[in-house]
C-alpha cells in the first residue's frame, strides 16, 4: 500500500514532530510504501529535516507549498501535487496542517486518490487571524471536508 503524507513545513513543532514520527514508524511496517511531501523549511522555530534526511527517498520538497496565503503559489502547489499524486498513484494521501491539508486534499481529489485523510492538529482559523484569512480558511475547510474520507484529531477539543 502506497501512502503519501503531506505537511506544509518541517519546522520544530507538535504537528510536524507527530507527522515525522508517524511516517518513520509506518515506513518500517511490511507492505507499506510511505513517503513525505513538505514545503521548504523556513522560520525561527528550527528544522526537523535532519530526522528524515537519512532515509533515502522519504522526502519530496515542494517549494510552492508555503504557509501564508499566496494565490499564485497555492494554485501552483495544487497543480504540482496533483501531478505528483497521478505519477505515484498512492492508495492514501494523509494531510497535516491547515495549508497542506486544504491544498493536498484538493489535489488528491483531482488525482483520483481513493482515500483522503486529514489530521487536525490544531485550528486553521480563529481569532488569531484577520477576518479575510479566517473567512478564506473556513470556506476552504468546508469545501475540502466534502471529499475527505477520514478525519483524525489529536485531541477531543479539535473534533468540533
Model-derived segments and spans:
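Alpha-helical elements of Rossmann-like donor-binding domains used by nucleotide-donor carbohydrate transfer enzymes
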Residues: 21, 76-83, 103, 139, ...
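Short His-centered aromatic/hydrophobic patch
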Residues: 95-101, 120
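Active-site proximal beta-strand in glycosyltransferases
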Residues: 3-4, 92, 108-123, 141, ...
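Nucleotide-sugar donor phosphate/pyrophosphate-binding loop at the beta->alpha transition
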Residues: 72-79, 114-117, 124-147
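N-terminal strand-loop element at the rim of the active site
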Residues: 5-73
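Glycine-rich phosphate-binding loop signature in dinucleotide/nucleotide-binding domains
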Residues: 84-91
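A short, active-site helix/loop in glycosyltransferases that binds the activated sugar's phosphate group
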Residues: 147-160
